[in-house]
Amino acid sequence: MANTNTLETTARVGYAARGIVYMLVGGLALMAAVGAGGDTGGSRDALASLLDEPYGKVLLAVIALGLLAFAVWREVAAVSDADHRGSSGKGLAIRGAHVISGFAYLSLAVYAAGLAFGWATGGGSGGGSGDEGAQGWSAWLLAQPFGRWLLGLVGLVVAGVGIGFLGRAWKGDVTKHLRYAPEQRGWVVPLGRAGFAARGVVFLIIGGFLVLAGWQAQSSEARGLGGALRTLQEQPYGWVLLGLVAAGLFAFGAFGVVQAVYRHIDAPDVDDAAGEAKRAAQRGARKIG
């Protein structure tokens, strides 16, 4: 029971940390949209902005721990199937995506810790660190056999995830894992729908640029979160588009804090999770052999 409670606490801390990062990204982008300063950067730019705030390094250290917790929970939940996705093609795809996102949040946690303890330096305004990361791995993928097709396929998958988010925002159950009072539904559901809609738009833009990068065999066409936001800003009435999506990202961040409090966490026992991970590794080794 103690091990289960430890994992549940880890998950809740992680959801809160992810929510804070999204609120930072959305808040800064919203400020940029209305001309009140801000920035249209990605997650790393948002974290770097805390260096200019009082006790910013302390905040970064706390967020780094939270992101590490979320990375751990993503891997544990994917391996143990804590969300009961099952072993169907769709279920395995979602669990696989969670494994990948776990490593992404681990990288973000290391970056936040680097800012807090001086291992890393923050980018400038609109530094595009997210774009540089996307362009870096896109260049690596393009250098592989059939790289253009692989990058295009990744772009289509990302865009497909975006469409899925939009569908969930439109008529899906965004609160199926939450346990909250009926009177809270009036604000929890709209918050979740706005958040998933904004993520859907961002993923569609990122996926589209990845397809373009693959089609043209130019990694410089790839965009990350910051690049997607700047693309919106550069359109006619861009401040409106950016403002809407930025508000949605902030809403998704707030929804993350709601998840930290109200989400049903079916955390496995630590020993059971370790055993399942070992069995999964053994099954994978047998398939390779």
Segments predicted by a language model, with ranges:
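C-terminal functional regions that serve as terminal interaction/effector modules
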Residues: 2-5, 9, 16-28, 61, ...
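Hydrophobic, ordered structural segments
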Residues: 5-6, 28, 54-173, 248-251, ...
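Short, charged/polar, low-complexity loop and linker segments
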Residues: 1-8, 144, 182-185
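Peri-membrane helix termini and adjoining interfacial loops of integral membrane proteins
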Residues: 34-45, 121-135, 174-178, 217-226
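Short, membrane-exposed interhelical loops at transmembrane-helix boundaries
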Residues: 41-51, 137-140, 184, 219-241
